[in-house]
């Protein structure tokens, strides 16, 4: 192993999908929450997506940063998988996001073959057992909470009222709700 051979303190974090309101707008989670806000604001009519059955292990990005810091605080360097240990489909994300906003995604989502990936991986789920066992780490933010945080942030960015659960979840588990805002 390279790090042992050269006596280096080096760790690898194998990070599964990590999301937040800062996520780029072309990534499916942010594409969904931003489109939801735009639809509610009357700026957009439909959201075009590809494979809704694809499943991913989506976690909350700030927690992954905390995990990376924790990995670096250990006496011995090791590699860790960082994720939630749960996989959810894009359809589940739509159900959660639009349901939270009292909307039916079926009214707004259109399937567009252009968004199907030729080499789509249908299922990705992290095995976080080593992180749980050795570092006593597991994510605090659950899937539905992550979605609510992201929906509230995009509704707020669009100047709309939010249901408010996202902010409550964030404040209960972290600190300043406006920490996600882009700095100008």
Residue map of PLM features:
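C-terminal substrate-binding subdomain of Rossmann-fold SDR/epimerase-dehydratase oxidoreductases
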Residues: 23-184
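Proline-glycine-enriched beta-turn/loop adjacent to the NAD(P) cofactor-binding site
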Residues: 16-19
């Amino acid at each position: 192993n390279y790090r042992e051979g050269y006596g280096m303190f080096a760790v690898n974090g194998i990070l599964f999908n990590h999301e937040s309101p800062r996520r780029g707008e072309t990534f499916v989670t942010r594409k969904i929450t931003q489109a939801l806000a735009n639809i509610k604001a009357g700026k957009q009519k439909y959201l075009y997506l590809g494979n809704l059955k694809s499943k991913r292990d989506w976690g909350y990005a700030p927690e992954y940063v905390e995990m990376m810091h924790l990995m670096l605080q250990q006496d011995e360097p090791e590699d860790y998988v960082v994720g939630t240990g749960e996989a959810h489909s894009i359809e589940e994300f739509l159900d959660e996001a639009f349901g939270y906003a009292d909307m039916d995604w079926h009214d707004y989502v259109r399937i567009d073959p252009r968004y199907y990936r030729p080499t789509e991986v249908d299922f990705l789920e992290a095995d976080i057992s080593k992180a749980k066992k050795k570092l006593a780490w597991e994510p605090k933010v659950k899937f539905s909470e992550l979605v609510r945080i992201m929906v509230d942030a995009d509704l707020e960015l669009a100047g709309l009222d939010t249901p408010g659960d996202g902010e409550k979840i964030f404040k209960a588990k972290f600190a300043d709700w406006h920490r996600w805002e882009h700095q100008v």
